[in-house]
């Protein structure tokens, strides 16, 4: 059964991540307005809740629930640069800036110990893949150019990230203790890794 998530009349929207706990369904996303910025939000059992950000707008890209707290990762535009952030129960927390670079938070995972792990990247003309562990930035030293991290998963004591690098041709990768490239079978096509699960 398809469930249409409500947004203001005639606006387009995107659902970016989903989390299910018992009978509760949490969905992160954002919607466009006719004249204003993009609005980050989440839906709980079909009810929409807008998330605070600057007047430049933002996107909510990943959602998780831990010990009753609704935690959402994303980013927003502060008028000068894009700023990676997360919301916990509707309160926005900025992740540390890296100089004057844009920063983006794409995915989050809560570790068994309750640590908030967020994957993303930073940079302007070039990028660096990274993740934040409770706000502390840790770079992923990916070998290729323009790397980004799209996904993260905490398993045991390990932190796994997945993403891609490259420009004209992209190569998907995942990283645990070292980089593992996910090259296409015939070597001719681009690949992206956009989510990761460890069992």
What are the roles of these predicted feature ranges?
Residues 1-199:
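Residue-level hotspots at or immediately adjacent to binding/recognition sites across diverse folds
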């Amino acid at each position: 059964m398809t469930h249409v998530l409500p947004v203001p009349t005639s606006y387009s929207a995107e659902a970016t991540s989903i989390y299910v706990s018992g009978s509760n369904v949490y969905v992160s996303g954002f919607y466009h307005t006719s004249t204003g910025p993009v609005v980050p939000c989440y839906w709980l059992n079909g009810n929409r809740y807008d998330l605070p950000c600057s007047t430049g707008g933002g996107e909510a890209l990943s959602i998780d629930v831990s010990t009753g707290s609704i935690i959402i990762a994303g980013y927003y535009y502060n008028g000068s640069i894009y700023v990676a952030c997360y919301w916990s129960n509707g309160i926005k927390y900025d992740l540390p800036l890296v100089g004057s670079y844009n920063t983006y938070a794409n995915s989050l995972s809560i570790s068994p110990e309750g640590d908030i792990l967020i994957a993303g990247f930073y940079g302007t003309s070039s990028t660096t893949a990274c993740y934040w562990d409770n706000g502390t930035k840790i770079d992923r030293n990916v070998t290729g150019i323009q790397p980004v991290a799209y996904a993260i998963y905490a398993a045991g004591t390990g932190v796994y990230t997945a993403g891609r690098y490259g420009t004209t041709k992209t190569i998907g990768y995942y990283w645990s203790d070292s980089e593992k490239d996910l090259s296409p079978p015939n070597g001719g096509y681009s690949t992206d890794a956009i989510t990761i699960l460890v069992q």
